[in-house]
A protein has these predicted regions:
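Glycine-rich phosphate-binding loops of nucleotide-dependent enzymes
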Residues: 1-232
Length: 232
């Protein structure tokens, strides 16, 4: 990345678009603390976290999903979300919860499942789910952390048309108290969900604006749409 500046305000819906290799995921990883930038700074919720690890940023209220599934096929949907709340350490549950706290964590897990419309699968094993349902569970796990900001890395990748519509409805309906930032190749979803769009190319931000401005921008057409991009 080169001279990238991303300023997102509380409650905003922001999409980051660009072809493969544009630097989108690298930018995500720097923000989340999974990668340390060679220069520059990262500020979250008014605090400089440039040298802080990912777990510290998560405690501040940052949650994310990944392009590749990180779910365990042998767990149920409910247990997957539940464990994302109580945490694990050394392969075991981190300290045993008191009954009241355990019930509260279970209810948070179920509420997160309801939010992403996967509650009918709470007892199903993750290994039995479709690709789209995997995405729903991953988002539920992130939401169960009750984040201030949610970052989604290509959530529509590999989804069917119907699953993309379900995802779009889910993201549009998210609590406005949660700041949403998503990387997407699906321009239709990004422009329907986001209020502002950041377009990247070769590690640089080339355009930033509203969905209407992005649709009308000649640079976007020349460097992105004109390079074989096709909405399906």
């Amino acid at each position: 990345m080169d001279a990238v500046n991303l300023d997102v305000v509380h409650g905003e819906r922001r999409a980051i678009l660009g072809p493969n290799g544009a630097g989108k995921t690298t930018l995500f990883n720097v923000i989340c603390g999974d990668v340390t930038a060679s220069s520059g700074s990262v500020e979250l919720f008014g605090e400089d976290v440039t040298r802080r690890p990912a777990r510290y940023r998560a405690k501040l209220g940052l949650a994310r999903t990944y392009q590749q599934s990180r779910l365990f096929n042998g767990l149920t949907v409910e247990d997957s979300i539940y464990l994302s709340i109580v945490g694990v350490e050394g392969g075991r549950l981190r300290p045993v919860l008191l009954p009241g706290r355990d019930r509260a964590a279970r209810e948070r897990a179920r509420e997160a499942a309801r939010t992403v419309a996967i509650s009918h699968k709470l007892g199903a094993l993750v290994g039995s789910l479709s690709h789209g349902e995997h995405r729903q569970v991953a988002i539920a796990m992130a939401l169960a952390a009750e984040p201030k900001a949610l970052m989604l890395d290509e959530p529509a990748s590999g989804l069917s048309r119907g699953e993309r519509q379900l995802l779009t409805d889910l993201l549009v309906g998210l609590d406005r108290a949660i700041t949403l930032i998503l990387i997407e190749h699906d321009m239709d979803i990004a422009l329907r969900v986001a209020e502002r769009v950041t377009m990247m190319h070769d590690g640089r931000v080339i355009v930033e604006g509203t969905p209407a401005e992005i649709r009308a921008n000649e640079t976007v057409h020349d460097l992105y749409l004109g390079r074989g991009y096709r909405n399906e």
